[in-house]
Amino acid sequence: MASLSLAPVNIFKAGADEERAETARLSSFIGAIAIGDLVKSTLGPKGMDKILLSSGRDASLMVTNDGATILKNIGVDNPAAKVLVDMSRVQDDEVGDGTTSVTVLAAELLREAESLIAKKIHPQTIIAGWREATKAARQALLNSAVDHGSDEVKFRQDLMNIAGTTLSSKLLTHHKDHFTKLAVEAVLRLKGSGNLEAIHVIKKLGGSLADSYLDEGFLLDKKIGVNQPKRIENAKILIANTGMDTDKIKIFGSRVRVDSTAKVAEIEHAEKEKMKEKVERILKHGINCFINRQLIYNYPEQLFGAAGVMAIEHADFVGVERLALVTGGEIASTFDHPELVKLGSCKLIEEVMIGEDKLIHFSGVALGEACTIVLRGATQQILDEAERSLHDALCVLAQTVKDSRTVYGGGCSEMLMAHAVTQLASRTPGKEAVAMESYAKALRMLPTIIADNAGYDSADLVAQLRAAHSEGKTTAGLDMKEGTIGDMSVLGITESFQVKRQVLLSAAEAAEVILRVDNIIKAAPRKRVPDHHPC
């Protein structure tokens, strides 16, 4: 019986696209490595910045070296590249820093995997080797961690060092000492809660970054109404989200016809009476400050002024949410049951000037740890980047307060982990040892890139660093001020254990996910169905 020769059958819809085997794997590697190459020049204390220009009606300009911000604002089409973008976003959400490191490490792992697959080593063999290497690296990192949580003086110094290390690679590096102090003082005010919502950051154009300061209490970027008290002590605050205009007729297309101007006056009088009744219901709460998410129109503003109540309108939603948190109040929208409404409180509300702008200052708030950091700067781009840099430092410090373990930076931890993985590879038989060696090489690429970005001879420096760790100098790292190998414990270059651990695990998992891919299927674009119905 003659054998039948079956032609390949296409099971996908017309327009669908499929990449198989080596083509799919190569496509994934190229996309991931390209993302790593894009952000690696921003790594380290001498990293460069990127300018991001958005097109369209609301075209904006952004100058940043924050890995998560860069990746979030570029559009990527490659599936593997999207995996790395999502991974950097998770890193930013989880620990706040290490977004560039995690992306670069994952890309370097895949670069090594590409050369191993070219040598006919199976992806599953590589993954098995990587998993053992990750365990060894994590254990080495754990063994090197130092915990000063029980010693208040040393722990504060650790926090100062961590904030300084985080800010070294940011725009704020030239004012590092000033912002390190601001960030540490703000986080220590939280008393271990780690609730960063209590730290409010306000950006005000003018002055220089060195003019930025930490303010006790809460600042609201609004003005007090006309003919209202400008200062209130022992404030009782009602925070609301309610319309302070008369209720409009809600029937679509409805109209009111009158046959005389007297009738118009009657309608206006009825509206005023209705608003007066609403204001009286609000005043029954026994308050001396009313803050509304929506507008407060002229008539109710006059009524509040006559009653000696400070009225603040159109407070932004985030500001209102945070104000409710720090004053201990709740946002109300109905006022029929005053006994059920939780009022906010603070010792003093007053109007203050920052630059040329008036703001409202709440001091002695119920949440004692609340504070505001006021950022000053010459341009909006500088202020935005300063806020991102400060956010990273605050997130890392909040993590360190929860888990006080620290490790050394400057490529020290990466070289320590690479040394442990290399030792494991030398004791491991078979092809998995080759995968472990590639893992160690990827880890060593991080100090290599840091040295390259600073303009130093990376081959020489990394060789010296590797030799130092082989001799048992476990605190040796890169000193990018002098371009030499230095003792990180003496230089105070410290990083959070949680950040380093998250970088290691996230990069290994993301690289493994991409390495497992052997097929990429793109769905057919959805076709628009013409509408033949008459209008």
Curated annotation (Swiss-Prot):
Chief subcellular location: cytoplasm
Top-rank lineage group of the source organism: Eukaryota
UniProt binding sites for ATP: G44, G98, T99, T100, E495, K500
Positions of post-translational N6-acetyllysine modification: K13, K154, K181
InterPro entries for this protein: Chap_CCT_beta (IPR012716), Chaperone_TCP-1 (IPR017998), Chaperonin_TCP-1_CS (IPR002194), Cpn60/GroEL/TCP-1 (IPR002423), GroEL-like_apical_dom_sf (IPR027409), GROEL-like_equatorial_sf (IPR027413), TCP-1-like_intermed_sf (IPR027410), TCP-1_chaperonin (IPR053374)
Residues at which ADP binds: G44, G98, T99, T100, S101, S168, S169, G410, E495, K500
One annotated GO biological process: chaperone mediated protein folding independent of cofactor
Protein localization: Cytoplasm
Chemical reaction(s) catalysed: ATP + H2O = ADP + phosphate + H(+)
Residues annotated for Mg(2+) binding in this entry: D97
Residue(s) carrying Phosphothreonine: T261
Pfam families: Cpn60_TCP1 (PF00118)
SUPFAM superfamilies in alphabetical order: GroEL apical domain-like, GroEL equatorial domain-like, GroEL-intermediate domain like
N-acetylalanine: residues bearing it: A2
Glycyl lysine isopeptide (Lys-Gly) (interchain with G-Cter in SUMO2) cross-link site: K248
PROSITE patterns assigned to the protein according to its UniProt record, in alphabetical order: TCP1_1 (PS00750), TCP1_2 (PS00751), TCP1_3 (PS00995)
Keywords from the UniProt entry: Acetylation, ATP-binding, Chaperone, Cytoplasm, Hydrolase, Isopeptide bond, Magnesium, Metal-binding, Nucleotide-binding, Phosphoprotein, Ubl conjugation
Phosphoserine: residues carrying this PTM: S3, S60, S260
EC number: 3.6.1.-
Function: Component of the chaperonin-containing T-complex (TRiC), a molecular chaperone complex that assists the folding of actin, tubulin and other proteins upon ATP hydrolysis. The TRiC complex mediates the folding of WRAP53/TCAB1, thereby regulating telomere maintenance. As part of the TRiC complex may play a role in the assembly of BBSome, a complex involved in ciliogenesis regulating transports vesicles to the cilia.
PANTHER family in alphabetical order: CHAPERONIN
Subunit structure: Component of the chaperonin-containing T-complex (TRiC), a hexadecamer composed of two identical back-to-back stacked rings enclosing a protein folding chamber. Each ring is made up of eight different subunits: TCP1/CCT1, CCT2, CCT3, CCT4, CCT5, CCT6A/CCT6, CCT7, CCT8. Interacts with PACRG. Interacts with FLCN. Interacts with DLEC1. Interacts with SVEP1.
Family in the record: Belongs to the TCP-1 chaperonin family.
Name of the protein: T-complex protein 1 subunit beta
Gene: CCT2
